[in-house]
């Protein structure tokens, strides 16, 4: 996340170090013509390299909670044991911003927004993060990065004929980061990531119903004061109420909920 969860140039409004900062897109558009990136030449390694560089850019341009911050301490406690999960090497940080979101990238980077942490219990956060890990494991994040690379209209930055992506300028990284966060997963991809998140909770003996309660919280937000923002974020997702019901049905079948 998008996913958690969407063509503009610059990405972030940075209000240095405050919890009132907002992670947002401005309304400028990329003027260059879109150039094709053939799937055959855009590898997993390309996606991971671009993702790492884009996330590094976002980390520099957002208020990241330091190691001694209560948000970081809490996330370490919740998720620290899962940095190596299902063959993936994961890293995580907290952005101290007012938007409610979390996302994962093709290099295994997971970023959680402090406003999401404020509204979720520990196990609900694990459900959200498990969902995001699902997008990485299912290669959804690779496909999103390839699409972002195309939308950012800088495919001529590709290096050799082997398809290895060369170093990018700061403005190019900002454009790719922006396009990456605007990427939307299909409903099928979201449902499959939900299944992965459920199984992540089940495998580690967490309360699987935390995923249902997380969806219900998002559903309540989408009908409240933040309706327009939440509706935009969730527009490509299956209905949150339906997602909660699907979790309940699985839990009943597995004997984990009555």
Specify the residue positions occupied by each region the protein language model found.
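Bacterial N-terminal signal peptides that target proteins for export
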Residues: 1-8
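Bacterial N-terminal signal peptides
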Residues: 8-16
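Sec/Tat signal peptide C-region and signal peptidase I cleavage site
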Residues: 17-21
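A Zn2+-metalloprotease active-site environment signal
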Residues: 22-258
């Amino acid at each position: 996340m998008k996913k958690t969860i969407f063509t503009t140039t610059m990405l972030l409004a940075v209000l240095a170090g405050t919890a009132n900062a907002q992670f947002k897109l401005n309304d400028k558009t990329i003027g260059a013509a879109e150039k094709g990136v053939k799937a055959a030449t855009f590898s997993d390694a390309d996606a991971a390299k671009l993702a790492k560089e884009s996330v590094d850019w976002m980390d520099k341009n957002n208020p990241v909670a330091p190691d001694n911050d209560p948000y970081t301490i809490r996330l370490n406690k919740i998720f620290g044991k899962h940095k190596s999960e299902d063959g993936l090497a994961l890293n995580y940080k907290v952005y101290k911003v007012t938007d409610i979101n979390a996302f994962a990238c093709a290099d295994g980077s997971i970023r959680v927004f402090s406003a999401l942490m404020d509204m979720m219990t520990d196990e609900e956060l694990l459900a959200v993060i498990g969902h995001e890990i699902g997008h990485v494991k299912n290669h959804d994040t690779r496909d999103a990065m390839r699409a972002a690379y195309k939308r950012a209209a800088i495919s001529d930055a590709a290096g050799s004929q082997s398809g290895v992506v060369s170093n990018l300028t700061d403005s190019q990284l900002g454009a790719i980061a922006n396009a990456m966060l605007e990427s939307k997963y299909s409903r099928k991809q979201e449902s499959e990531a939900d299944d992965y998140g459920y199984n992540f909770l089940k495998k580690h003996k967490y309360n699987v119903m935390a995923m249902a309660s997380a969806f219900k919280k998002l559903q309540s937000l989408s009908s409240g004061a933040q309706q327009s923002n939440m509706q935009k974020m969730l527009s490509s997702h299956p209905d949150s109420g339906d997602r909660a019901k699907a979790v309940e049905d699985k839990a009943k079948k597995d004997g984990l909920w009555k």
